[in-house]
Design a protein with these regions (language model features):
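Hydrophobic alpha-helical transmembrane segments of integral membrane proteins
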Residues: 82-112
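Mid-chain, well-packed structural core segment of small domains
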Residues: 49-90
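Membrane-interfacial loop-to-transmembrane-helix junctions in polytopic alpha-helical membrane proteins
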Residues: 1-4, 40-47, 72, 76, ...
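Short, charged juxtamembrane terminal tails flanking transmembrane helices
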Residues: 1, 115-126
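Hydrophobic cores of alpha-helical transmembrane segments in multi-pass inner/ER membrane proteins
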Residues: 11, 55-61, 103-107
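Hydrophobic transmembrane helix segments
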Residues: 14-51
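Transmembrane helix-loop junctions and nearby membrane-interface residues
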Residues: 17-27, 63, 67-70, 92-95, ...
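Interfacial segments of alpha-helical transmembrane regions
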Residues: 1-14, 80
Length: 126
């Protein structure tokens, strides 16, 4: 199997950030022109826009870190799969029409036991 979990997370992060820019472009322009200090707490719309963008950046960092671990051949921790699954399930329950569904494949892949006795990272290095 190819290394794909980190790349998947990076792709989701890029997509998430693109959606943020599409949905909140006007809000970001207003935040920029009015000054960034405290811009994320001016109202609920500004807060949502700020969190949407910041979460995309965090997801990108996580995806890049997972990619680095996959390339090194080190084992990806099962706790990452548990955390991603928890995030996906809670996100889907709170917002069924959302991108949280895209977090399920890597979460489940991280939780799936190796069939040949190798760890997940070695198996994905294929």
């Amino acid at each position: 199997m190819k290394r794909w979990i980190g790349r998947w997370l990076v792709a989701v992060a890029v997509l998430h950030t693109g959606v943020a820019l599409a949905l909140f472009g006007n809000t970001y322009r207003t935040m920029w022109s009015d000054g960034l200090w405290g811009a994320g707490v001016r109202d609920a719309g500004h807060s949502a826009a700020a969190w949407f963008l910041l979460f995309g950046i965090l997801a990108l960092a996580a995806g890049l870190a997972v990619s680095a671990v996959e390339r090194s051949g080190a084992r990806l921790p099962r706790s990452l799969g548990v955390a991603l699954l928890g995030l996906a399930v809670l996100g889907i329950v709170l917002m069924p029409v959302s991108g949280f569904w895209l977090v399920l494949p890597p979460a489940l892949a991280l939780l799936r036991p190796a069939r040949d006795g190798t760890d997940r990272a070695a198996r994905s290095a294929g």
